[in-house]
């Protein structure tokens, strides 16, 4: 009888232990499944929100070719801004080259002459035969551009086609067309007007060496959102003229966010090379901030 009571007690204790373990495991699973959201998630950003000044001690580079070791952005740097030097960030799944310039920050050239810039120059295609080209690709984010309140002096360039020509006229290293971002303002939710998107314009020459209002024309291309990742492609080169056998066209074809914006350069017979620069250039009021990632470059030369 005593043995039966002992066995019965033992069975009851085992059942109780198993039930308690099962409940504990179920509670643990419920606790693991509970996800507590972050009440104040912080968005990834590499935007400069500090004060806008001409120069900083850290940004005052001694030479135009000041660069970081092994930059991820391709091309030879031309840094003519004492506000900030080229640097890089790692956000949004990419490594980004940071290009920040401010009004009045060109410490390399004579005062009140050339505009601030941090650009990268790519080796030029020096041939003019059909099939010669220079092609640049990258991903761009625009965070801020210069603004004076007047269209002609507002906006900042993020890319340009370059190329010398015969017969003289204009700069010794003339731009062919420049891609300019203009600010579009909207409410930030707190009653402040801030730059929320950007109109992209192509500033193109009317003739070789053209500059100023008489020598260039602005053509609206499209609008992009602030901080939007935009696939960019620019190809500058020579191709056969379908309407004039034996002659070639000099062209600058851009693709911005999947949309094509092709353009034939005036006086193609005078062109002798095709080149590209990108980064940040021109700010006549405030600050400009561009970010570049996944940059690549190819060229071909056909005589």
Curated annotation (Swiss-Prot):
MF terms in GO: lyase activity; metal ion binding
Cofactor: Ca(2+)
Main location: membrane
Segments forming a coiled coil: none
Pfam family, one: PL28
Record keywords: Cell membrane, Disulfide bond, Lipoprotein, Lyase, Membrane, Metal-binding, Palmitate, Signal
Lipid group attachment sites (N-palmitoyl cysteine): 23
Binding site for substrate: 157, 211-216, 281-284
An annotated GO cellular component: plasma membrane
Membrane topology qualifier: Lipid-anchor
Top enzyme category: lyase
Highest taxon above the source species: Bacteria
Binding site for Ca(2+): 59, 61, 79, 81, 84-85
Disulfide bonds: 55-82
Similarity comment: family membership: Belongs to the polysaccharide lyase 28 family.
Protein name: Ulvan lyase NLR48
Protein's organism: Nonlabens ulvanivorans
């Amino acid at each position: 009888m005593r043995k039966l009571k002992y066995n019965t007690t033992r069975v009851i204790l085992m059942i109780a232990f198993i039930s308690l373990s099962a409940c504990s495991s179920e509670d643990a699973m419920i606790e693991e499944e509970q996800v507590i959201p972050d009440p104040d998630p912080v968005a990834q950003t590499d935007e400069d929100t500090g004060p806008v000044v001409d120069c900083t001690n850290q940004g005052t580079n001694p030479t135009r070719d000041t660069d970081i070791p092994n930059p991820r952005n391709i091309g030879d740097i031309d840094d003519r801004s004492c506000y900030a030097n080229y640097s890089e960030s790692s956000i949004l799944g990419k490594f980004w080259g940071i290009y920040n310039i401010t009004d009045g920050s060109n410490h390399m050239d004579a005062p009140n002459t050339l505009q601030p810039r941090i650009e990268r120059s790519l080796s030029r295609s020096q041939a003019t035969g059909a099939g010669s080209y220079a092609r640049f690709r990258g991903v761009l984010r625009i965070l801020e551009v210069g603004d004076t309140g007047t269209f002609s002096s507002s906006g900042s360039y993020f890319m340009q086609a370059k190329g010398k020509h015969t017969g003289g006229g204009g700069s010794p290293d003339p731009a062919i067309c420049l891609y300019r971002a203009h600010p579009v303002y909207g409410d930030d939710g707190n009653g402040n007007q801030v730059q929320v998107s950007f109109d992209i314009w192509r500033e193109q020459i009317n003739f070789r060496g053209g500059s100023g209002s008489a020598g260039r024309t602005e053509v609206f291309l499209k609008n992009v959102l602030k901080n939007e990742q935009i696939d960019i492609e620019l190809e500058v080169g020579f191709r056969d003229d379908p309407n004039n056998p034996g002659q070639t066209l000099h062209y600058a074809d851009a693709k911005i966010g999947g949309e094509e914006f092709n353009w034939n350069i005036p006086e193609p017979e005078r062109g002798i090379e095709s080149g590209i620069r990108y980064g940040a250039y021109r700010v006549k009021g405030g600050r400009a901030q561009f970010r570049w990632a996944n940059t690549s470059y190819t060229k071909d030369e056909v005589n």
